[in-house]
């Protein structure tokens, strides 16, 4: 996905409050600051703005706010009504995810998009144990640093029961991670699971495809993995029933 980025100097020159007024929707429920590269300092200023209290959807893709910026936002009482938060490409790291997870205000999120943020296994335990995500339906963690260990942490979580979409594309989930998901009974509402490009072989793919633990599943994406005939056969058997779409190429 490509965004038009303003230079750092230009973004900093514009007062953040002016940017907000220009980019907030007419009904003041959606704020789109995509690609402005506002950085940690302006993220802190943003967090202090009372005008955010009506915002339900916040787009902050490509702003390099880092852990310092998201910590300020996570501590802002003005974001208590937020339901949709997109943080693609912000260099949040594990400290950033931990700040989101521990926020006393970000408890109403329905979608949380954290792709390409250098998130590793280290912070996933905080995510998995948090009671803040009772309403979360969409969780995007693609393009991060998640290994089989981290995948198992997510798979074993009992606090993500409402998820309908889980995206772990382009991590290092591997066979052990795929098997952990196949054994999980904690995703009764999951409709879409994306595990493409995760170094998964037939050993992990087949039990996941054959798992009976995803009653609502509609799409299982295993594309761009190291898959052979056993996976193709398992996918064919499921695909012909036309209830679940298995992508494996």
Task: Give the ranges of each region predicted by the language model.
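Leucine-rich solenoid repeat scaffolds
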Residues: 202, 206-249
